[in-house]
Regions:
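Sec-dependent signal peptide recognition
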Residues: 2-9
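C-terminal motif of bacterial Sec signal peptides marking the signal peptidase cleavage site
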Residues: 14-17
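Acidic/polar, low-complexity intrinsically disordered N-terminal segments immediately downstream
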Residues: 19-162, 166, 459-464, 472-517
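Short coil/turn segments that connect the beta-strands within blades of beta-propeller domains
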Residues: 131-132, 191-192, 251-253, 363-366, ...
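Recurrent small/Gly-Pro-centered beta-turn motifs in extracellular repeat architectures
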Residues: 135-140, 197-200, 257-260, 369-372, ...
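Hydrophobic core register within WD40 beta-propeller blades
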Residues: 147, 177-178, 186, 408-413, ...
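Preference for solvent-exposed, low-hydrophobicity sequence contexts
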Residues: 157, 162-166, 178, 182, ...
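Intrinsically disordered, low-complexity segments enriched in Gly and acidic/Ser/Thr residues
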Residues: 374-478
Length: 517
């Protein structure tokens, strides 16, 4: 107890002495640094591009930043922590020779008089000319499948003859050219692929060089004894990229559908990008495979297994991410349409996944265009979540308003409007299917040029409601233009984006976004 009292007294005396201390200190101003003229990010091509940064440094003491008093160091730090020193000068002007990837670039300034150090940072992406941009697939003048890229690593540059120079055999019937998205972690990097999909074969290319071989055929990642795999061709992959960074609706699961109606599903955590038996059957032991329409329905922002269409029995089916087979779907009272279309006589014509949020479905609704035996057309809107799909709405197309709809060969659903664009007899139409307010708009924008592609952007800037339209004529070759659909619900207009218009292209059939990974 006596010991505790002594401690308490000592503590009180200490507090009092601190309170009475009015100080007798000498304060010295120190030099401070303010950085400027450094961008938020830089993109370079390895062993090619000069990285040039000339920062401004304002010193509070008025000292010149070029004085011998200061030491400089530019350090790149990779995502795994590896460090690379690029320069030891205030400004940097050098060709970057780093492994491909994303880095944090630090500028460190040390005052050799005071030993104080200041640091600022920016982001550096090191890639090849193929690192980022728009992937195009279509036909060349000989009618063969060909691919191009609008590289956007620095200034936009058109790269042609990608397939011709890839090492792959000559291909026919272009379908798609896609990047599967940025991996969740480096352990998933093996599952990241650039796919070339054509009617004569599906192959993946090296992401850095765009080179491929016949050994990169889809059959090399399929492990099933139920069907021969040598001639299989991919026509759709889910999930796909949902933003310019390369994010996808799931980093752990993926599905593919082939041209002959097989649906494969995998867990990349377990199998990487390898696939076992097709899941479009009714039990894990069944050898009876149901033919699937060549499209996978799913919410763009949240993939949890495929919803697919059984063309043999005309019904929508589902499989979860862990399924080895598929499930039939049960209707609820007052549903806008039945999952089983066998009783309606309707068949699936076209499917599309969008960012439509009707019904509170923020991950995105899907659309199915149906046709019955009498030639009538219907739009089904659904939330195609693999474990729990929901129906959102159904609309019959008024063919008295939708001119030449039965002749349509291309379709595109707006995410933000009740509007279906279509091309019939080389004319572009927009049909507003809002019940009771149906309207039709025709756009004469392309003269005699052939319309070769119609597709909404769901990858680069989905919120813009941008429609990409490709055309072709023998004189000026292929052209791709980005149009923005207006928001006014009373009218449909298209505004062309002069900064996003490219010509001298192949006959474009499809496009997608290539992110930086």
């Amino acid at each position: 107890m006596k010991k505790m009292n002594l401690i308490l007294v000592a503590f009180c005396l200490l507090i009092q002495s601190c309170a009475n201390d009015e100080g007798n200190y000498d304060y010295i101003d120190i030099n401070e640094v303010e950085f400027g003229n450094i961008n938020e990010e830089y993109n370079v091509m390895t062993n090619s591009t000069i990285l040039e940064i000339d920062p401004t440094l304002t010193m509070t003491e008025g000292v010149s930043p070029d004085s011998d008093r200061f030491a400089y160091e530019w350090v790149c730090v990779a995502s795994n922590g590896t460090k690379y020193t690029l320069a030891t000068t205030r400004s940097i002007n050098t060709i970057v020779s780093l492994p491909l990837g994303n880095y944090t670039l630090y500028l460190k300034v040390k005052d050799k008089v005071t030993d104080l150090q200041w640091t600022t940072s920016t982001y550096l992406t090191v890639g090849t000319i193929y690192t980022k941009g728009i992937l195009l697939i279509g036909e060349n003048e000989e009618g063969n499948a060909e691919a191009q890229m609008l590289s956007m690593v620095e200034d936009t540059k058109l790269i042609s003859n990608i397939l011709k120079n890839s090492g792959l055999p000559t291909l026919k019937g272009p379908i798609n050219f896609i990047h599967t998205g940025t991996p969740y972690s480096s352990s998933y990097d093996v599952a990241v692929k650039v796919w070339v999909m054509t009617e004569s074969g599906s192959y993946w290319l090296d992401r850095e060089s765009m080179q491929g071989t016949i050994e990169n055929h889809v059959s090399k990642i399929l492990y099933t004894s139920l069907v021969p795999t040598e001639d299989l061709r991919i026509v759709d992959v889910a999930p796909q990229i949902i933003n310019s960074r390369g994010s996808v609706g799931s980093n752990f699961y993926r599905a593919m559908v082939t041209s002959n109606g097989l649906v494969f599903s995998t867990s990349m955590g377990t199998n990487k990008d390898n696939y076992l038996d097709p899941v479009n059957r009714l039990s894990a032991t069944s050898n009876d495979i149901l033919h699937a329409f060549p499209f996978i329905f799913y919410p763009l922002k949240s993939y949890y297994g495929p919803v697919w269409y059984d063309t043999k029995n005309d019904r929508f089916m589902r499989a979860t991410t862990s399924s080895t087979y598929s499930y039939t779907l049960v209707d609820n009272p007052n549903d806008p349409f039945p999952w089983n279309q066998g009783t309606t006589g309707r068949k699936l014509v076209y499917g599309e996944n969008t960012y439509n949020k009707d019904g509170g479905k923020n991950s995105g609704n899907s659309f199915a265009l149906m046709k019955d035996q009498q030639g009538e057309y219907f739009i089904y809107k659904m939330y195609a979540y693999g474990s729990r799909p929901e129906k959102i709405g159904a609309y019959q197309i008024n063919l008295d308003i939708a001119t030449n709809f039965s002749d349509a060969t291309m379709y595109a659903f707006s995410s933000l409007r009740t509007v279906l664009f279509y091309v019939a007899n080389n004319k572009l139409y927009a049909y507003d299917y809002d019940p009771g307010n149906e309207k039709l708009y025709q756009f004469d924008l392309f003269g005699s040029s052939e319309i070769t592609m119609l597709k909404f952007d769901t990858q680069i800037n989905p919120d813009a409601n941008a429609l990409y339209i490709a055309t072709y004529d023998t004189a000026s070759k292929g052209k791709l233009v980005r149009y923005v659909v207006n928001a006014d619900p009373n009218i449909v207009t298209l505004t062309d984006d002069a900064d996003n218009s490219w010509d001298g292209l192949i006959k474009v059939k499809n496009f997608s976004w290539r992110p930086q990974k």
